[in-house]
């Protein structure tokens, strides 16, 4: 059973912290206890969430004020049971760090094909809203999948 989910993007200041917060909420709504975290392939350790991600998060009832970016490390990859990336190049980096077999591009895992989640960094709030809406849909699908897998595991 999956105990820890790790989201990966580039800077760990936009997409992955939003996705982590959205999945945490979706899992809680489904009664699942799964640790959710995030990291970036090119993150500056300690950087706060971008202003756009922070503001759009607030609009959705998410508080990213305490978020601090983390660089993706082998240790984070080893500790995660499931790693979901925003793009294929992030997946390649996870593979390099030993994550083969437990990494997927988010859209693929959510059953939406191989579409990547585009980076809103530098865009206006409308771009961030579009990204957050996409992440909301994808993370709901992930939560549904994890809930179904958990239910199957309980029946064994």
What are these regions (language model features)?
Residues 1-79, 144-156:
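Conserved active-site segments centered on acidic
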Residues 17, 87-88:
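Alpha-helix N-cap/helix-start capping motif
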Residues 82, 88-156:
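Phosphate-binding/catalytic loops
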Residues 7, 84-85:
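Hydrophobic beta-strand core positions in alpha/beta domains
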């Amino acid at each position: 059973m999956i105990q820890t989910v790790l989201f990966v993007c580039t800077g760990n200041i936009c997409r992955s912290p939003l996705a982590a917060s959205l999945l945490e909420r979706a899992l809680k709504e489904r009664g699942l206890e799964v640790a959710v975290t995030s990291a970036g392939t090119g993150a500056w350790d300690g950087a706060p969430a971008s202003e756009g991600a922070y503001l759009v998060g607030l609009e959705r009832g998410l508080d990213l004020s305490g978020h601090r970016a983390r660089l993706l490390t082998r240790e984070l990859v080893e500790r995660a049971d499931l790693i979901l990336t925003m793009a294929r190049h992030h997946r390649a980096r996870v593979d390099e760090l030993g994550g083969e077999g437990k990494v997927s591009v988010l859209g693929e895992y959510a059953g939406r094909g191989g579409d990547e989640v585009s980076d809103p960094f530098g865009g206006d709030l409308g771009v961030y809203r579009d990204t957050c809406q996409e992440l909301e849909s994808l993370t709901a699908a992930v939560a549904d999948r994890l809930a179904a897998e958990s239910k199957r595991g309980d029946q064994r």
